[in-house]
Curated annotation (Swiss-Prot):
Source organism, top-level taxon: Eukaryota
Tissue: Expressed in fat body.
Induction, as annotated: Strongly up-regulated in response to viral infection by the Drosophila C virus, alphavirus Sindbis virus and Nora virus. Up-regulation increases between 1 and 3 hours after infection with the Drosophila C virus. Up-regulation increases between 1 and 6 hours after infection with the Sindbis virus, exhibiting a dramatic increase at 6 hours. Induced in the fat body following infection with the Drosophila C virus.
InterPro entries: SVWC_dom (IPR029277), Vago-like (IPR053308)
GO cellular component, one term: extracellular space
Protein role: Probably involved in the antiviral immune response. May have a role in controlling viral load in the adult fat body, after infection with viruses such as the Drosophila C virus.
Full protein name: Protein Vago
Organism: Drosophila melanogaster (Fruit fly)
UniProt keyword terms in alphabetical order: Antiviral defense, Secreted, Signal
Pfam families: SVWC
Gene: Vago
Signal peptide range: 1-23
Localization: Secreted
One GO-annotated biological process of the protein: defense response to virus
Subcellular location, principal: secreted
Amino acid sequence: MESISSMIYLVAMMSLIIGGSQAIPYRPSAYLYNQQYCMDTLTGRQLYIGEVFTREDQCVRIQCLETLQLWEDSCQVPKLTQGNCTPVPSTNPHAEYPRCCPLYECKSYESNSGGTLEQTNIYDHYGTLRSSHLTEMIVIDGRTPPRGEIHTASARKYQV
């Protein structure tokens, strides 16, 4: 009798296990809510995967990658070889990246017998030419007047 009751108990337990596992609906892991984010340690800001922001008072763009790592983009100094180049600060340093990056103004001079040619090129932080300006200073009379002699135009008198 004892073996029959233990057999019934065993069959009942097996049916509960088999029936219970079929009652739990299958749910693929993609449907489970999994909160994953990156943490910017400088600002304490949490970023979800793919989210991007520009750090305040820094011209740096931060992005959260799928690997839960932060990617930082900052302004580069381009390798410019023509002319004397100086950085020109952004007119709006609180703008989003890359608008907050400085531009670079490069001036070059070329002299000839007729005058001087000044070329001003403006580049962005990638080294892409944004604008170019050409100024030519022409020498009309290369001779210097003798001392004491000042050339002036004749005065015109008008009556009202």
